[in-house]
Amino acid sequence: MTSAIKALVSEYDEKWSALDVAGVAELWERGTPQPVYIGDEYAAPLVGVDELDRHWARVASRLKRASVSSRLVSADELAGGLVRCILLSRWSFTGTESDTAHTGTSWITWLLIARGNTYRIFHHMEAQVYLDEGYP
């Protein structure tokens, strides 16, 4: 389980850092359970494939550079073959409107569903955090 999840985290980081937003979207479940994204930038959760597709289109049109590096903090198997993961993600995004990079760190909680030998994200909750210098 852990090696497949670490591979998913690496793929997530690589695709974001390459601005392969379509590739990031492919890491998500598109069937059942319905995908859910909860992030600070939205007043309400995004639920379902259509809302996520609009989100990916917005993101792809607004970014010109990205760098993402995430660390898997924990992964727990839940009932029904589901997995809960906690990641610490350090990121830098530069929008199309300027050359100023926006950097930060976020805690991310994923719920994953097994699909063959891989996992797909069906729930992503992210909150930016301000950590002390030297925090691992």
Set out the residue ranges of the language-model regions:
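A short, structured loop/turn motif at beta-sheet edges
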Residues: 75-84, 99, 112-120
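Short beta-strand edge/turn micro-motifs at domain boundaries
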Residues: 103-136
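Beta-strand elements of well-folded, non-transmembrane domains
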Residues: 91-97, 112, 129
